[in-house]
Design a protein with these regions (language model features):
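Short amphipathic, positively biased membrane-proximal segments
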Residues: 1-136
Length: 136
């Protein structure tokens, strides 16, 4: 069984690496989706645009603590569930070649599973404030 902390850190690393690839080598990501970048490089812009966002939300999962981390974990579920729905619709419509479409669905579903695992584990976490009540 995957523990929540490992799920969160794994998802963070995936986000950081994918975001960095989007920023620095969008053509590689486009190629993995079956796009001939010699003919069409229009996808480079959105990959770069979302690359920095993806890096930052990955860093949030590594660096935030307490309530801020719980919020980031909760948002990760929404983000990756939406990605999975988007990948599924894209594959079903044939907007990507079959193999790449199915791979996008599988990858998105794995990320959603990691996000849910991290979020559920975070719900069970007890904050220091709850353990040691603060008197003011």
């Amino acid at each position: 069984m995957l523990i929540p902390t490992a799920a969160r850190k794994t998802l963070a690393v995936i986000r950081i690496l994918n975001g960095a690839m989007g920023l620095l080598a969008p053509e590689k990501l486009l190629g993995r989706l079956g796009v001939d970048t010699a003919q069409d490089r229009s996808g480079a812009y959105p990959f770069r645009m979302f690359g920095i966002r993806t890096v930052l939300i990955g860093l949030d999962l590594l660096l935030l603590r307490g309530a801020e981390l719980r919020r980031a974990e909760k948002l990760a579920v929404l983000i990756h569930a939406a990605d999975t729905v988007s990948a599924t619709v894209t594959a079903a419509r044939g907007d990507l070649p079959r193999k790449q479409g199915l791979m996008a669905v599988v990858i998105s579903a794995i990320n959603t599973t990691l996000a849910v695992t991290a979020w559920k584990g975070g719900q069970d976490a007890v904050t220091a404030h709850e353990v040691v009540p603060q008197s003011h």
